């Protein structure tokens, strides 16, 4: 099940959001918001209050003369209760 949550995202924006108890992950494209909430609550033992998702546009990549695209992904911003935290980001 945790294979569906690919990895945590560490960027300037995600570091700012950690102060507001919002954590950022890249997840499988097929997951829905209720499934993401269930996965995060079950794996990290926290209470999720909100789940925001977005799918950034795909980016072109050149390999020699051929033009390809980077794989698509879904980015999730999960808000948890104020008195809790996720230890991965600590």
UniProtKB/Swiss-Prot annotation:
It comes from the Eukaryota. GO terms for molecular function: rRNA binding; structural constituent of ribosome. Part of the 50S ribosomal subunit. Belongs to the universal ribosomal protein uL23 family. Binds to 23S rRNA. The gene is rpl23. GO terms for cellular component: chloroplast; ribonucleoprotein complex; ribosome. Keywords: Chloroplast, Plastid, Ribonucleoprotein, Ribosomal protein, RNA-binding, rRNA-binding. This is Large ribosomal subunit protein uL23c. The keyword Ribosomal protein applies. HAMAP family: Ribosomal_uL23_B. It is found in: Plastid, Chloroplast. It comes from Oltmannsiellopsis viridis. GO terms for biological process: translation. PANTHER family: 60S RIBOSOMAL PROTEIN L23A. Coiled coil: none annotated.
């Amino acid at each position: 099940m945790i294979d569906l949550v690919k990895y945590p995202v560490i960027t300037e924006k995600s570091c700012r959001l950690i102060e507001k108890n919002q954590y950022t992950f890249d997840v499988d494209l097929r997951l829905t918001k209720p499934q993401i909430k269930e996965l995060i609550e079950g794996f990290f033992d926290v209470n999720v209050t909100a789940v925001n998702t977005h799918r950034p546009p795909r980016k072109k990549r050149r390999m020699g003369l051929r033009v390809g695209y980077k794989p698509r992904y879904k980015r999730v911003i999960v808000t948890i209760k104020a008195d809790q935290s996720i230890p991965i980001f600590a």
